[in-house]
């Protein structure tokens, strides 16, 4: 069994796996539309983490992990707990970055619009402000954003995830503005 990571599963791999491959899935786009009250925010002041939205022209880069033989159900149970808060699973085709490796099926966790933590679309400025101000048990929401942006940049330098990188730029501008105010 393979699982596709497109958010924190890319850079916070706290589960056993047998193999991993960089690649992408199609027909989706990555968006910071999922609320987080258990990791990057708190009830009443949620952070924002990524989910996938259907997009016929979309392409999302990430990492596929092969779960260890004989431990698939145990690891999946852990991931089900980690990805609680409104995520459902589906199966999609994964296209490895290495063109000599054939595409194959992966399990995908998606925060759907009918879950209680789904925040949905908002102006990028508003999303950036929410990320800038949010923190939860797993840390600051800015850390999540920056780790994800850096991971995508390192794994797939040619990828131009406009939503992700535009948010990163807006949040960094806010951080620089706050530092400049502290120097006055």
Curated annotation (Swiss-Prot):
Gene Ontology CC: cytoplasm; cytosol
A Gene Ontology BP annotation from the UniProt entry: glutathione catabolic process
Catalytic class of the enzyme: lyase
UniProt keyword terms in alphabetical order: Cytoplasm, Lyase
Binding, substrate: 3-8
MF (Gene Ontology): gamma-glutamylcyclotransferase activity; glutathione specific gamma-glutamylcyclotransferase activity
EC code(s) of this entry: 4.3.2.7
Transcription keyword on record: no
Subcellular location as annotated: Cytoplasm, Cytosol
Reaction equations catalysed: glutathione = L-cysteinylglycine + 5-oxo-L-proline
Domain of life: Eukaryota
InterPro entries the UniProt entry points to: ChaC (IPR006840), GGCT-like (IPR013024), GGCT-like_sf (IPR036568)
Active site: 83
Family listed: Belongs to the gamma-glutamylcyclotransferase family. ChaC subfamily.
Subunit structure: Monomer.
PANTHER family from the UniProt entry: CATION TRANSPORT PROTEIN CHAC-RELATED (PTHR12192), GLUTATHIONE-SPECIFIC GAMMA-GLUTAMYLCYCLOTRANSFERASE 2 (PTHR12192:SF2)
Task performed by this protein: Catalyzes the cleavage of glutathione into 5-oxo-L-proline and a Cys-Gly dipeptide. Acts specifically on glutathione, but not on other gamma-glutamyl peptides.
Protein name: Glutathione-specific gamma-glutamylcyclotransferase 2
Organism: Homo sapiens (Human)
UniProt gene name: CHAC2
